[in-house]
Each structure stands twice: as structure tokens, then as C-alpha cells.
Regions:
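A solvent-exposed interaction/effector surface
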Residues: 2-185
Length: 185
């Protein structure tokens, strides 16, 4: 009976992964190159890591101890100053609702939840796993044009990647909180 329950859980996790991928692809198709306002996703902060490499090591370690944690997303946290774009850390986030498919090994009380500020939102294609300064600067210009005052924090999620024209292209989901609505200029 235990074997069947474990097989069922693995099957349910596979379905959850497929639904996540389907949702990501739909969002890419709908939001690529468009700016909008969207709340930052509610998620469990599984780990705060110094950079993407440490995030990958942590992800592999956690995924091997708690089945299903491979569904965590890597959010690179950056700071935009108007002059520079600097990497701060990488967060491993597990979207709220996915914990239901992880089983008893996942103790949700051990993890804090993300805040859900309203953010300037877009999805962009990039040659890199991080956005560059110009990409974020364009986002800030859009915000100012619409009377929004962006904060310095930028969250970049590498949703997926593909190989085309002899290079890898990453689809980056970008969130940039704003602190107030200013008068449009």
C-alpha cells in the first residue's frame, strides 16, 4: 500500500510540474515584451543564496531530501540604482499551493512567505539568466511614463530557455515593486 501511495504522489507531482510549465508558457505568450502591473507571487522562501550557483547547489540538495521541491523557482534579486544593476542574491521560491503535493516531509512552518507588493511586470528574452541594465531601464521609463515610481529592487525569474540561431535564449519574468503612484509627466 505504501508503494502505491508513493507512486500516486510522484504521479501527482508530475502533473503539477506539467501544469506549472503550461502556465509559464501561457504567460510567456501573453506577456512577452509587454509591461503591466501585477502582484509579486505569494510563495514560500525555501532558501536565500548568495548567487545562482549557490542556489543551484541548494536546490539539488533540497530536491533530494524533499520530493517535489524541484518545483521551486529561482528568483535572482537585483538592485537598480539608475546608474547600475547589481546582483544581490538568489531566492528559491515555492509558489503557495504547491506544498499540498509535497507530502509530510515539507514543514511549511519552517519557511517565511514572500510579501505581495504590486510590481511593474514584464517578460523579456535575454542571452543571459539575468536582465541587463538597459532592459530594466526601459521598464523604469515605462513606469515613469505611467506615473509610477519604481523601487530599486528587481526580481528576475528564468522561466525557461530555448536554443535558436546557434545560441541559448532565456525567457525572464521581471518584477519591480513601486512605492507610490506619482503624477504622470
Amino acid at each position: 500500500m505504501a508503494e502505491e501511495e508513493e507512486a500516486l504522489r510522484r504521479h501527482n507531482q508530475a502533473i503539477m510540474r506539467l501544469k506549472l510549465f503550461e502556465k509559464d508558457i501561457s504567460r510567456i505568450e501573453a506577456c512577452m515584451g509587454r509591461y503591466s502591473i501585477r502582484k509579486f507571487p505569494k510563495a514560500y522562501v525555501i532558501a536565500n543564496c548568495s548567487d545562482l550557483q549557490e542556489g543551484l547547489r541548494t536546490w539539488f540538495k533540497l530536491s533530494s531530501t524533499i520530493p517535489g521541491l524541484d518545483m521551486a523557482y529561482f528568483y535572482n534579486v537585483l538592485t537598480y540604482t539608475g546608474q547600475d544593476l547589481e546582483e544581490k542574491e538568489t531566492q528559491l521560491l515555492l509558489y503557495e499551493g504547491l506544498e499540498k503535493g509535497l507530502g509530510q516531509e515539507f514543514n511549511r512552518s519552517l519557511y517565511s512567505m514572500t510579501e505581495e507588493p504590486e510590481c511593474i511586470y514584464t517578460i523579456i528574452e535575454s542571452e543571459y539568466t539575468h536582465p541587463d541594465f538597459d532592459m530594466i531601464h526601459k521598464m523604469v521609463q515605462w513606469a515613469h511614463k505611467h506615473g509610477l515610481e519604481p523601487m530599486e529592487r528587481v526580481y528576475a525569474n528564468d522561466m525557461t530557455s530555448f536554443f535558436a540561431k546557434d545560441k541559448t535564449t532565456y525567457c525572464l519574468e521581471i518584477y519591480m515593486p513601486f512605492k507610490r503612484i506619482a503624477s504622470p509627466v
